[in-house]
């Protein structure tokens, strides 16, 4: 019989183990913090020991004892070994957030094929590799949540981000295909598509000019966004908890855009 009642406990992550890739700072850190506050055990990885150590210390400063691992998300053998180690030391992963990513802002005809491949490797191939590593144990356990950090750039184009947009467009479709292939195993795979978020990656676009004026791109984004501001990593916390919790058990293959309305807005008519 279907349970027709609602309980706020549906949003609880108590007893869950969450792996968030590249979560020493920024969006990944904010999502991890929200998961910990919802009751989950936090596991994260980063590319080197220094970043992992800094991440562990940052988590401790906010009262979270996180488990940190050094691993390159593009190294398939390394990821397989890391997941096995996590299962032995912490437990089977219930929630995976494919957060690690990079961007290269270069006009397409000036971008090397090597740089293009690097973005694709980290932003698209890595979520495939990490998801592939965790899904078998999720199937055995009878449930699992995978959240891919996509982007509004999977829906529109802009100069200098061809590799990033291509990777995030591919990640959107990987999300839908994981949902299609493993939904019957009670695995939900969804994506969060952030708009322009104030992180270290976007800091150069928000720097004040020498005369004290706003960066032209900063002005452009604020004018183009109905919310009239950049997003913050904390704006992704609620959506991330929803997609990791039982409250989203019938949501699968969906990209939840958290963009302040930018995708819905054609822009203001010039006066």
Where do the language-model regions lie?
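Residue(s) in the substrate-gating loop at a strand-loop-helix junction
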Residues: 151
């Amino acid at each position: 019989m279907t349970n027709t009642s609602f309980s706020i406990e549906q949003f609880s992550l108590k007893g869950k183990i969450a792996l968030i890739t590249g979560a020493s700072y920024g969006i990944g850190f904010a999502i991890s913090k929200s998961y910990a506050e919802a009751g989950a055990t936090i596991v994260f990885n980063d590319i080197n020991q220094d970043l992992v150590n800094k991440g562990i210390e940052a988590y401790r400063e906010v009262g979270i004892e996180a488990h940190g691992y050094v691993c390159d998300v593009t190294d398939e053998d390394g990821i397989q070994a890391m997941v096995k180690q996590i299962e032995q030391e912490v437990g089977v992963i219930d929630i995976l957030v494919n957060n690690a990513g990079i961007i290269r802002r270069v006009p397409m005809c000036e971008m090397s094929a090597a740089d293009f491949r690097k973005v694709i490797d980290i932003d698209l191939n890595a979520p495939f590799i990490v998801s592939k590593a965790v899904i078998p144990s999720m199937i055995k356990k009878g449930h699992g949540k995978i959240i891919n950090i996509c982007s509004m750039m999977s829906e529109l184009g802009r100069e200098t981000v061809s590799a990033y947009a291509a990777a995030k467009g591919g990640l959107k479709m990987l999300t839908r295909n994981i949902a299609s292939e493993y939904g019957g195993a009670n695995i939900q795979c969804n994506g969060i598509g952030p708009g322009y978020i104030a992180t270290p990656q976007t800091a150069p676009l928000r720097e004040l000019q020498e005369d004290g004026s706003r960066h032209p791109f900063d002005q452009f984004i604020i004018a183009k966004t109905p919310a009239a501001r950049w997003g913050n990593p904390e704006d992704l916390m609620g959506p991330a908890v929803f997609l990791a919790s039982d409250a989203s058990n019938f949501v699968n293959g969906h990209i939840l855009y958290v963009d302040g309305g930018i995708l819905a807005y054609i822009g203001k008519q010039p006066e």
